[in-house]
Amino acid sequence: MFFCTRFMSLIVFLTLVVAGCAQVPKEAGFNDVKDLVEQRVDYNIHWNQQTEADLEVEKAIKELLKEELTPEVSVQIALLNNPNLQAIYEELGITQADVVEAGLLENPVIFGQVRFPDKSSEDNNYEFGITQNFLNILMQPSRKKLSTIRFEQVKLHVANEVIQMVAEVRKAYFTVLGAKQIRDLRNEIALAAGNSFELAQRLHSAGNISDLELVTENAHFEQSRLELARSETALLDAREQLTRLMGLWGEQTDWRLPEQLPDLPSDEFPLEQLESMAVENRLDLAAERKAVEALALALGITIDWRWVGQIEVGVSTERETDRTWVTGPSLAIELPIFNQRQADIARLEAQLRRSQKRLTAQAIEIRSEVRSLRNRLIMQRNMVDHYRRTVLPLREQIVDLTLKNYNYMLTGAFDLLMAKQQEFEAYQKYLEAIRDYWIIRADMQRSLGGRLPGHMHSRQTIQTETAAESKKN
């Protein structure tokens, strides 16, 4: 009886100790995510956890918004402030809790019974006991290892979401800046069309042009007004998209942009060995590898323990009706007669094969995507160069020659205005080509895992730590 009492006390004590020591770290692997991100892009990230550092981040964002936005500043604001990204960071806390839970023992079960004798001369029968799931204790190391692998998978997934956000913000930035320039250009086209229509009205009043020519100029003018309205709507939509990505609202939405799209870089980044670089650096591919690793481990654990069912050990004590106590250990073992976990094994085998095939498919898709983006980037640069060196100079030459003919009275004012409008139209196509180049380049950066080969970002030095945190570090 003394041994059994000590055994019962030991179970309770160990359970309380383990439960008392188990705590969920607040950091939840975020530093690992920061390391993964900083290896690929030169931006700061911050997890809003209601600390003093959050105030420093708010101040930093206010300072950044005082100046015209650049692609780098827009990305930095989004990484610090985007609420969807903050929600994704919470996945770290959820999975960290799963890791902690995997290291916990199941709670012991205490039971008691009272039996009433059918003879009034005898005392009641009492029985008390405590049991513990012993299989849960034996499998604890395997559970912790499996949950750790899944935690690593989630960290890779979260870091990949940051890389995706960088690309989305850069694409949104160049979209809105291109829309701004196109809107300004469409405004000039509308003004030119308006001047042409006013001239047509005067000439028509003087009887120098026909009704058809007047109506034609009117139609051109109204069409230019529609195109201007369409460009203004596109600008507003693009601006709101960037505002959403940066997580701004209220007075913060009154941010400013530069006047024009940046020129193309003078030299393109190296275009060799891009596929292998992408396969090596892509975090979503690394996360899928972790998924395969986790399923393989889960399958191995299930196979190893398929013949071991539920095992419960404990101790119980009973007072008989004659007031004598009977105490001893208890053992309950599940016999795997009907269910040897065949279904679990088959399910995990299928899930593992599915994950392996997904991994192969994803690697193929990444290689294909990189090749496609490389081709598009080359073609887009060639298109921009063709507009700059050939199309635009030709349009300028047409305007100059038409102006000379107009001065010599060899052509009419409408021809000159039409030539100028066509020059504007060509310039709009040129702006769209530059915009699309930068969007494709942002996609290429994402496709390669975050960093372009041979390309260094300008680091955004934004302090997001409190002085106290800096001292700790």
Q: Which positions does each model-derived feature cover?
A:
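Short segments within alpha-helical structural elements
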Residues: 194, 223-250, 358, 366, ...
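A small-residue-enriched
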Residues: 22-45, 76-136, 239-248, 272-343, ...
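Phosphate-centric recognition/catalysis
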Residues: 390
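Terminal intrinsically disordered/low-complexity segments used for targeting and assembly
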Residues: 2-77, 232-277, 445-473
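Amphipathic alpha-helical coiled-coil scaffold segments and their short linker/junction regions
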Residues: 64, 74-81, 146, 153, ...
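Periplasmic alpha-helical coiled-coil/stalk elements that build and connect Gram-negative outer-membrane
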Residues: 22, 140-142, 149, 156-277, ...
